Design a protein with these regions (language model features):
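Charged, low-complexity intrinsically disordered regions
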Residues: 2-186
């Protein structure tokens, strides 16, 4: 298992190249300020990857203040299946909406469609998934932090967001494992 409540904060600058890649692939909106927290790296559910909480802020000139444009979960997985090329997977699992139709039809097997359907049922269209040269990049815009910890004198009530975040991470690992399902490596 892993401890989401006391997850490690990523070392300063360690995730910057990865965050830039998420922006280039179109998984998250571009912004001037990034804050990453609760970094987790390791194998889970049959896939090796990492997940972290990310907040993206963009400067809004007319209001003279930064505006939050993304606050959610980002994950990157190294797939065992040697997939070459790039494809964007839509949350509805429709292969005709993928950016590379041939690759999308090949990858959208029933287990992958089921994993995408679970994510869509929970988060609607706030999911962005891109496969690029054997790596799966997924972002879910939750528009909230992973943890809403109570204040100093507040009672710890309604802590349902902690298991909900754990479920989100588990569903992302399930998606990566589904993409690798049936792959023997030979």
């Amino acid at each position: 298992g892993y401890d989401l409540i006391y997850g490690r904060n990523p070392p300063r600058g360690r995730l910057k190249p990865l965050i830039t890649l998420f922006e280039i692939l179109g998984c998250i909106p571009r912004g001037q300020y990034h804050v990453a927290r609760h970094w987790f790296v390791g194998p889970l559910g049959g896939a090796d990857g990492q997940a972290f909480e990310l907040t993206v802020w963009r400067w809004r000139e007319e209001e003279l203040r930064p505006v939050r444009v993304f606050h959610g979960l980002c994950a990157r997985f190294a797939l065992a299946r040697p997939i070459k090329g790039s494809v964007r997977l839509r949350a509805d699992g429709n292969p005709d909406q993928g950016s590379d139709l041939t690759l999308a039809h090949r990858l959208l097997t029933p287990p992958v469609r089921a994993a995408l359907a679970r994510l869509r049922a929970r988060h609607g269209d706030r999911i962005s998934a891109v496969i690029r040269d054997g790596l799966l990049f997924v972002a879910i815009d939750l528009q909230r932090p992973w943890y809403r910890l109570p204040g100093l004198f507040a009672e710890e009530v309604n802590m349902t967001h902690i298991p909900a975040t754990a479920d989100d991470i588990e569903m992302l690992w399930d998606l990566a494992a589904a993409l690798d399902a049936g792959w023997s490596g030979s």
